[in-house]
Amino acid sequence: MKSTKLVLGLLVLLMASAFTVTTSANWKLKEDAYSVTFKGGKVDGIIKVLNTSILFDEANPEQSKITALLDVSTINTGNGMMNKHAKSETGLNAKEFPVIKFESVAVTGNGGMFSAIGKLTIKGITKEIKLPFTFENKGAEGVFKGTFNIVTKDFNITRTGTPDVLEIALNIPVTNQ
């Protein structure tokens, strides 16, 4: 009888250890503290976030899911004419495509450095990108930081004077929900 209980106990323990529990945290953007900037050539500016969904677990990054929507109408280069050009049909075409979307399909991490592989949609064109980032965990708060480049012609941004490559920099302070 004792040996049966021991065997059953070991079997239950073995089965329980085969399943891992993930503890991904749901992070909320700090509305007035973030920055999404772009620069390239003589162009630089900011764009505002419309919405985010950040489910991130630094111990198990493969369980993470990140989605962000940016509001094209909020582009600000500090120059009214340049803003108008950026939102025009040969720029980002804010009228027809008011949102830029990023949605991760995989998140990996190693030694505090992470990468979100995802689909970036600009002007109705979707390309897979790799977004390297760091995460500074401060308990109930944290900060995501990352930089990546986009080739403007890949997204049919053809306005004369537009740089071939734009560097996008993210500084995203968050709170744990």
Report residues per predicted region.
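Bacterial Sec-dependent N-terminal signal peptides
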Residues: 1-26
